[in-house]
Amino acid sequence: MDDWPERYSAALELDLTEEEGDAILGLARDVAHATERRFAPLSAYLAGKYVARRVAAGANSADAVHEAQEVVGRLLAE
């Protein structure tokens, strides 16, 4: 089911670029490998909430995803 992200985002009537999908998957991967695996889905969910809040405030979604990645990187480096 390689087309799962496209199918799911379409069913939710959301736009998901390949870059955004790759970034969120990378974020989840980093969390899964550096902490407990079970935190990866929760981290992806929280990143999504953060992105939605930033976009509602006028930010670009790609920039907001990048910001969420930076926060993960910073926290995992501590």
Model regions and ranges:
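Electropositive phosphate-/nucleotide-binding environments in soluble metabolic enzymes
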Residues: 2, 18, 25, 38-41, ...
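Active-site-proximal helix-loop elements at catalytic-domain edges
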Residues: 1-14
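Short helix-capping/linker segments at secondary-structure and domain boundaries
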Residues: 36-39, 50-62
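A short glycine/serine-rich beta->alpha loop
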Residues: 28-38
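C-terminal structural segments of small proteins and small subunits
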Residues: 58-78
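Acidic-glycine-rich active-site phosphate/pyrophosphate-binding loop
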Residues: 13-27, 78
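Amphipathic alpha-helical interface segments
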Residues: 47
